């Protein structure tokens, strides 16, 4: 059986050569761009408890978003309304923002967070949850104007993102 893993080793090689978190972020965004994704938010997933709002900034690993959207999201504590974060409370599988919006019990949260994100060109995205051996949960949420991802691409995206997380 002939396997051509050239692309896989190339992408993992970029990540291996990244010397810091900024380099990992750049590699991930370069990889994500081929699927229509241009933004990245990653961090340790909080429980949905507004009393921990002051602790949220310490959980952020990457926040490469349109600056105005990042400021609004953080100032308004949208993390506690975000359908993506709500879904992460129970789902450890890769999913799209559309999946999160469709499964959200609050249409108001979908309209508020999803609607406002779309004003900044963040219409759809892909979320890769990463469960640590210690029980902590991180998630990498990639967003953009469109999500063009087949089933095999999604599995490969998860491999790349998990490898990147291991580089942090």
For the regions a language model picked out, list residue spans one by one.
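Positions that flank functional sites
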Residues: 47, 103, 132
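Regulatory sensory and allosteric helical modules in signal-transduction proteins
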Residues: 60-108, 114-118
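Juxtadomain coupling helices with adjacent low-complexity linkers
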Residues: 1-12, 143-168
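Short hydrophobic beta-strand micro-motif common in sensory/regulatory domains
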Residues: 124-130
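Alpha-helical bundle regulatory/interaction domains
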Residues: 121, 136-139, 164-165
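Short amphipathic alpha-helical segments
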Residues: 9, 13, 21-33, 110-114
């Amino acid at each position: 059986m002939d396997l051509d893993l050239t692309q896989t080793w190339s992408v993992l090689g970029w990540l291996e050569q990244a010397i810091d978190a900024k380099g990992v972020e750049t590699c991930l965004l370069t990889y994500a761009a081929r699927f229509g994704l241009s933004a990245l938010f990653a961090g340790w997933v909080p429980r949905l408890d507004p009393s921990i709002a002051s602790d949220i900034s310490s959980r952020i690993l990457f926040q490469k978003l349109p600056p105005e959207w990042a400021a609004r999201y953080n100032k308004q504590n949208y993390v506690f309304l975000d359908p993506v974060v709500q879904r992460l409370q129970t789902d450890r599988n890769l999913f799209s923002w559309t999946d999160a919006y469709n499964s959200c019990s609050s249409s108001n949260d979908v309209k508020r967070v999803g609607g406002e994100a779309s004003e900044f060109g963040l219409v759809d995205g892909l979320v890769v949850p990463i469960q640590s051996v210690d029980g902590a949960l991180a998630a990498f949420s990639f967003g953009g104007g469109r999500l063009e991802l087949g089933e095999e691409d999604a599995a490969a995206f998860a491999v790349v993102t998990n490898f990147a997380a291991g580089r942090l």
